[in-house]
Regions:
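Conserved alpha-helical segments that form or flank metal/cofactor-binding pockets of metalloenzymes
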Residues: 29-80, 141-164, 243-246
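Cys/His-rich microdomains that often coordinate metals
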Residues: 408, 438, 442
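Acidic/His metal-coordination segments adjacent to aromatic residues that form catalytic metal sites
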Residues: 81-102, 163-200, 217-219, 264-288
Length: 506
C-alpha cells in the first residue's frame, strides 16, 4: 500500500499570495481606466501596484478566526456587565456625558469609515490594497456595532443615549466629526487614505483609544474598556495600512510628493480640530483622571508624531504646516471647548458643569502656565452667577467655522486673550474661520466648502424656521432631561438613588 505523503504546509508568504494576488484578474470587457475611473482623478502616479505590501499579510481565513475570538470575549464581558448592574460601578454619573459624546460623535464616524473603505476596496486596482481595504471596512462596521451594543445598557437607565443617530446628522456639535468624514468620503481614493489612514487612525485613534479607554478603566466602566481594547488590535493594523499607503505613493513617483504633503497638511489640521472634543472629555469629563490632554499629546502627538515625520523625512515629507500652531493651542483648547459647551448646554444632549475646587487644583497642576491665569477666573465667575441663581446661558447662536464647523471659540496662537477669527470673500460672499489652518483649507478648495451644511444657518430654514422648541424636537432632544447642568439633573438623582440601594439595606 502506498503511503500518503503529507502535503507541505504553505508558508505565510505563499498563503498570502494565493489568497490575494492570485485572486486578481486582468479586465477584458472594459479597459482598466473604465473599471477604475478615480485612480487618476487626483494626479497620483502609480507605476506598479504589486509593490504595495501588507506588513501583516493577513488573509481572510485568519481574519475570521481572530475576529470571532474577539467577538466571543467581548460579548461575554458586556453580558456580565449588564447582568451585574455594571452601570452602577462607574465613579460618578458625570462620566456618562463622555460616553454620550462618544456615542453621538465617534461611533457614527466608525460607520462612515466603514463605508469609505468598502468604496476604496472597489476603486483601487491593486489586489493587495483591495483586500486590506475590505477587511478594514468590516473592522470599522464592527467597531460601530460593538460600541453601540456596549453603550446600549446605559440607555436603559440614563437620558441622552436614545437618539445618537439623529444627533449625528443634526446636532450642532456633532457636525464637527460629521464634516470631517463627509469631507473624506467626498475625496478621491488616495486622499481618503490620508484622511482616515493617517489623520483618523494615527492622529486621532492613538489619542482616543489609549488614554481615554484607560480613563474608562479608571472610572469603573468595563463595557467601554472592553470595546476599546477589542478595537485597538485592529487599529494597529489600520495605522499600518495608512502609513504603508503614504510610503507607497511617495516611492512610486517623485511627482506625488507635493500632493501627499498638501493632504498631510490639510488632514492633520482637520484631525487636530476634531481632537478638541477628546481633550475636553479627558480633562473635564472623567471624574477619575488618568492623564491630562497635554500629557497625552506629549506622548502620542509630540513623541510618536515626531518619530513618524522623522521617518518620512527621507521621502521629502516635512511636519504638517499647522504643527506649531497646534502645539501652542494644546494648553488652551480643552478649557475653551468646555467653556463653550457649558454656556450652550441648553442645546446639548449631555450635561455639563462647573469643575469643583479639587478638579481645578488638578487642572492647575497639569496646566501651570495657563489654567490659573486664563481659565480659573472664568469658572469662578460662572460659579458666582450660578450661586446667585442666575446661571449663565448664551442664548445667541455661535458663529461657525466654514471648514471644521466648530464655533469660533479658540484664541490666537500667540494671544490667549483674543479670539482667533479669519475671513475670506469668495464669489461675493464672506466666509468665517476659526484658524489659519481652516482658512487655508477653504481657500485651496473653495467650491467644496461653500456647500457645507451649517447647523446654525439651518435653524432659520424649514422645517424649524427659528423655533428653538421645534429644533429640539427635530434633533430628538428632550429639554429638562437630556440637556442642561448636571447638578439637579435626573441622571444625578437616579444614579445616587440606585447606588444607595445597591450599597445599603435601607
Amino acid at each position: 500500500m502506498d503511503m500518503q505523503v503529507a502535503k507541505k504546509k504553505l508558508s505565510l508568504k505563499e498563503k498570502y499570495k494565493l489568497l490575494t494576488r492570485d485572486l486578481g484578474w486582468d479586465t477584458t470587457y472594459h479597459t482598466k481606466d473604465e473599471v477604475f475611473p478615480y485612480v487618476q482623478y487626483e494626479g497620483i502616479k502609480i507605476h506598479d501596484w504589486d509593490k504595495w505590501e501588507d506588513p501583516f499579510r493577513l488573509t481572510m481565513d485568519s481574519y475570521w478566526k481572530y475576529q470571532a475570538e474577539k467577538e466571543r470575549k467581548f460579548y461575554a464581558i458586556i453580558d456580565a456587565h449588564a447582568q451585574n448592574n455594571g452601570h452602577l460601578h462607574i465613579t460618578d454619573a458625570r462620566y456618562l456625558s463622555a460616553l454620550k459624546i462618544f456615542l453621538q460623535a465617534i461611533s457614527p464616524g466608525e460607520y462612515a469609515a466603514g463605508k469609505g473603505f468598502a468604496r476604496m476596496g472597489r476603486e483601487f486596482p491593486g489586489v493587495g490594497t483591495q483586500v486590506a481595504c475590505q477587511m478594514q471596512s468590516i473592522d470599522e462596521i464592527r467597531h460601530a456595532q460593538t460600541q453601540i451594543h456596549a453603550l446600549s445598557n446605559y440607555n436603559k437607565f440614563y437620558n441622552g443615549f436614545h437618539a445618537f443617530a439623529d444627533a449625528r446628522d443634526r446636532m450642532w456639535y456633532c457636525t464637527l466629526p460629521r464634516s470631517f468624514f463627509d469631507d473624506a468620503l467626498s475625496s478621491g481614493p488616495f486622499e481618503f487614505m490620508i484622511a482616515i489612514g493617517f489623520s483618523f487612525e494615527y492622529v486621532l485613534t492613538n489619542l482616543l483609544f489609549v488614554p481615554f479607554m484607560s480613563g474608562a478603566a479608571y472610572n469603573g466602566d468595563m463595557a467601554t474598556v472592553t470595546f476599546g481594547f477589542s478595537a485597538q488590535s485592529d487599529e494597529a493594523r489600520h495605522m499600518t495600512l495608512g502609513l504603508e499607503c503614504i510610503k507607497f505613493m511617495l516611492e512610486q513617483d517623485p511627482a506625488n510628493l507635493p500632493i501627499v504633503q498638501g493632504w498631510i497638511d490639510k488632514w492633520f489640521w482637520r484631525g487636530f480640530r476634531l481632537l478638541g472634543v477628546v481633550g475636553t472629555m479627558m480633562d473635564y469629563m472623567l471624574p477619575k483622571r488618568v492623564m491630562s490632554w497635554r500629557e497625552a499629546w506629549n506622548i502620542y502627538g509630540v513623541e510618536n508624531g515626531g518619530a513618524l515625520f522623522r521617518d518620512l523625512a527621507r521621502y521629502g515629507i516635512r511636519p504638517p504646516k499647522g504643527w506649531d500652531d497646534a502645539e501652542k493651542g494644546i494648553d488652551h483648547m480643552s478649557h475653551q471647548f468646555m467653556l463653550a459647551l457649558y454656556q450652550y448646554n441648553f442645546g446639548t444632549a449631555f450635561h455639563s458643569w462647573i469643575p469643583s475646587e479639587d478638579e481645578m487644583v488638578w487642572l492647575s497642576k497639569k496646566y501651570p502656565d495657563t489654567f490659573d491665569k486664563y481659565y480659573r477666573p472664568r469658572w469662578a465667575h460662572l460659579s458666582k452667577l450660578k450661586a446667585a441663581g442666575t446661571p449663565f446661558a448664551n442664548m445667541g447662536l455661535a458663529k461657525l467655522c466654514q471648514t471644521c464647523q466648530i464655533p469660533t471659540v479658540f484664541t490666537e496662537p500667540d494671544d490667549p486673550t483674543s479670539l482667533c477669527q479669519r475671513e475670506t470673500e469668495y464669489k461675493g460672499e464672506k466666509y468665517h474661520f476659526c484658524s489659519d489652518g481652516c482658512q487655508h483649507i477653504f481657500e485651496n478648495e473653495p467650491e467644496k466648502y461653500i456647500q457645507a451644511w451649517l447647523p446654525m444657518q439651518q435653524l432659520f430654514q424649514a422645517p424649524i424656521n427659528g423655533d428653538l422648541g421645534a429644533w429640539m424636537n427635530w434633533v430628538s432632544l428632550i429639554p429638562g432631561k437630556d440637556n442642561g447642568d448636571f447638578d439637579g439633573s435626573e441622571d444625578e438623582r437616579n444614579f445616587a438613588a440606585w447606588r444607595q440601594q445597591a450599597t445599603s439595606n435601607q
